Amino acid sequence: MGLKAKLQGSKENAVNSMIYKSYYDDEIDDNLVYLESRDGLDFTGNIFRIVEELSTGKYGDLKIYVHAKPQAEDKIRAYQKNYNLKIDKIITKEATATRILEKAKYIFTDAGIRPKYVKREGQIFVNTWHGTPLKLMGKDNVAEEHRLGNAQHPLLSSDYLLYPNQYMKSTMLEAFMIDRIFPGKILYEGYPRNSVFLKPSWLKEKLGLEDKEIFVYMPTFRGVLMDRDDSVQRDDVENYLSQLDSRLNDGQMLYAKLHVLNASRIDFDKFEHIEAFPEGYETYDVLNMADVLITDYSSVFFDFANSRRKIILFNYDEENYCSYRGFYIPLEELPFPKVQNVDELVSELNSAKGYDDEEFIKTYCQYDNPDAVENILKTVINGENASLVKTIGNGKKNVLIYAGSLTDDMINRLNEVVDVDEYNVVLTFKQWDEHICNNHEEIFKKLPQGIEIIQFRFNLTPTLSESNNSKSLLERSFQKQFPNIEFERIIDLTDKKDEISQILNNYIVKK
């Protein structure tokens, strides 16, 4: 659909008008805080701990708004009751969430953000991400390298990227190809969710489990995000839990929790010594009861290592898993015992911790501390120097190049014009381009070395007023696609003059 046709699509334009009214007309509300966890599918971890700290009232009379999909709303309300959280509004409607986003002063997320959100000057956006990476991601995960844009939008929109260790900072910025061009600040501080492991567990006593040896099993997500099969993991886990249940004694209890992306139900009623995580309590409060953590390829072990308690890797499907998902850290370099069957697992559960993890903790729990969330909010909201904050960048100007479908001829032209010695060269293309989606592995290998990629993720979404003012639409579309980034030059190598060309050429004229 061309630009003219989109400008005439009045029904959707009316919806966009409602969404972007805040962007164009409303002042930013200095007391409004917007938060979302896992794209609204969950409410746990860093985002939960930030809400918990904000609820103390130490940071002024703030209005706390949380976006959640309908299936997560009951969980949030249970947390409100058990933790006395001050949440002023739970937003379940997408359009409403985006409107509130556009006028919120403070924004916190641990993953993505509403796709129609456009960053505004004066907003403060903090991205905590959802864990130190073990598994390859971004450009390093070949199966999904052509979908970089899904993570780039919230990362580039951020004023602060939170990293609990130097390894995570370097790995993430390079994997998502923003290490040379991210214009915001790096917040070196502990993860809010990890502070619980540096304090005694209060939940074990509350649940009457003082005389129990507690095990927690938290397996990772399996599969490619766009091609999920929850039932496969559910069947595997259920089989192993059945075997394990018969081997545990009455003084032992195991709590099992599937990854949020594998939320298939398991019938726990048939087990004697195994239960699902108790509802109404934050995940890491439950995990902090554990004497032993059982996991596999999940980043949870980076966090739990703070407790200095035993970790077992139950990697029964290592060969198969590694066939489609690689690791930054070889499993054999991790200090934790690794088991492939229930017999080996039971043996380790009944054995004391027998490995040295001090170097691991020093590297991957580098900035974790009991006061992390307080330090973050003092820095972000109060403007205090409570955390280590750094900027990155190489001092070079940024150049943006649009090269269409990245045919061989276009790649040859790219190699002729790219100068990575003088500029940070950013390549953009349509994330949904069929030729690129079908041939991305071959194409990416041919691209010039040293360039960054920001995939063009969004179609035009005009409002009613923009139907008569395409310039405003093009300016907003550019800001949504390339938040916070300034370009010295923009080069359009195509002759199609499609939507992307119009957006980029409008930016050139504006400058």
Positions of PLM-derived features:
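Conserved catalytic-core segment of nucleotide-activated headgroup transferases in glycan assembly
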Residues: 44-51, 56, 191-267, 406-417
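C-terminal amphipathic helix plus adjacent low-complexity
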Residues: 342-406
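A nucleotide-sugar donor-handling region in carbohydrate enzymes
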Residues: 2-17, 132-138, 150-227, 261, ...
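Donor nucleotide-activated moiety binding/catalytic core segment of transferases
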Residues: 89-105, 260-302, 307
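Active-site and donor-binding regions of nucleotide-sugar-utilizing enzymes
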Residues: 34-197, 461-510
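N-terminal pre-catalytic "stem/leader" segment of glycosyltransferase-like enzymes
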Residues: 1-98, 392-486
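Catalytic binding pocket for nucleotide-activated donors in carbohydrate/polymer assembly enzymes
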Residues: 267-272, 299-365
